Amino acid sequence: MDSFPLLAALFFILAATWFISFRRPRNLPPGPFPYPIVGNMLQLGTQPHETFAKLSKKYGPLMSIHLGSLYTVIVSSPEMAKEIMHKYGQVFSGRTVAQAVHACGHDKISMGFLPVGGEWRDMRKICKEQMFSHQSMEDSQWLRKQKLQQLLEYAQKCSERGRAIDIREAAFITTLNLMSATLFSMQATEFDSKVTMEFKEIIEGVASIVGVPNFADYFPILRPFDPQGVKRRADVYFGRLLAIIEGFLNERVESRRTNPNAPKKDDFLETLVDTLQTNDNKLKTDHLTHLMLDLFVGGSETSTTEIEWIMWELLANPEKMAKMKAELKSVMGEEKVVDESQMPRLPYLQAVVKESMRLHPPGPLLLPRKAESDQVVNGYLIPKGAQVLINAWAIGRDHSIWKNPDSFEPERFLDQKIDFKGTDYELIPFGSGRRVCPGMPLANRILHTVTATLVHNFDWKLERPEASDAHRGVLFGFAVRRAVPLKIVPFKV
């Protein structure tokens, strides 16, 4: 009984918040009628990207949705995506920041969530001109080739023992090693080690917390109470990962101090140390460690998820697997590990990756954008402060764009010069414009080389052949992954 006045007051505040948020101009994009307080949240289901795709067929490519008190516009066509990300890219360059991202002050330092300004430009410049430049990628490819060799050796051991490989775990470890080699000239983890499991727990913990639906994001008045404990758990995971990254950085700074004449390593960590010591810009240690957090979490989670989807589609379509193996054999011959320089000679491999990204963009709604001012798009007003979600999943399965959109047909990309680098809005898994994913050059290489290494050297079969279509369920979150891990056995014919 004592709690009744508090609950009544809370209900009144929520209702008032909803009423105020709903009193908007009438020339908003069309959409389903929102219920009091909850808006359209009860309509979302477990797969919001699929729900939005269905609703957009009725309401159009610009659609209004109310997520609690958070007014949101869903974009579901390449034409409207181009308007948002290119034509009006500056207006829609803001970010809606989830409560979890406030952990350890990440929202104030992260390049992914900072407003477009001086700090953001400095960090973007480091990524574009130093970290992920073409020359940097070329200089570090020999390190990545070593890590691919380790993946091959692990798969060979499993093959000899008739042991199934959890593709998600193997892809995670390999992706983490490839990123660590590129960034730090080191191997972060070993297969089947305790360190591996700790890294996996932390990074998947961060990704799951950021991706979990949180009432405090839809009703900001609840944020101080953190009713689901999202912020508290995020502080723990973010803190653990930042401590590891800071350890890498501090160790290199100390090594530079004690051995000033030692040759520098050819990796991004040296660039970070140089940036801190020369102080050519206003970036501090925190900016760089939080940048590393973004790259490790975003890069490992999305690349891991996509590799698992690629392997699943190839297993479900054996004729595509055979075609890809034939191409790899013709180009690589007896070589075991693909060289990144061979990628232009492997058009079918490229088509397979594109087709998987079309069907299974790891982040189907991309990172949320926010309108920094009122803007009319396609005759509709998108008001200042509105959240904007680009439904890359819906665009990739649009019948008006793609023939047989639900089928895995890599051949469609052999005849079309469509790429996922941000200029073709039919295929935008990495986003586009000034907010395009900065790690795309590395992710592109990881997806192709890991897939090629697995397919070229082994034939594969499901650990449980009877578990096929029943395992197509997915889990929505930071990245949309398979609900049941893909476990497959490598073997030699």
UniProtKB/Swiss-Prot annotation:
InterPro entries: Cyt_P450, Cyt_P450_CS, Cyt_P450_E_grp-I, Cyt_P450_sf. It catalyses: abieta-8,11,13-triene + reduced [NADPH--hemoprotein reductase] + O2 = ferruginol + oxidized [NADPH--hemoprotein reductase] + H2O + H(+); ferruginol + reduced [NADPH--hemoprotein reductase] + O2 = 11-hydroxyferruginol + oxidized [NADPH--hemoprotein reductase] + H2O + H(+); miltiradiene + 2 reduced [NADPH--hemoprotein reductase] + 2 O2 = 11-oxomiltiradiene + 2 oxidized [NADPH--hemoprotein reductase] + 3 H2O + 2 H(+). One of its GO terms (biological process) is diterpenoid biosynthetic process. Pathway: Secondary metabolite biosynthesis; terpenoid biosynthesis. The keyword RNA-binding does not apply. Its main location: membrane. GO terms for molecular function: heme binding; iron ion binding; oxidoreductase activity, acting on paired donors, with incorporation or reduction of molecular oxygen, reduced flavin or flavoprotein as one donor, and incorporation of one atom of oxygen. Expressed in leaf glandular trichomes. The keyword Membrane applies. It is an enzyme of class 1 (oxidoreductase). Belongs to the cytochrome P450 family. This is Ferruginol synthase 1.
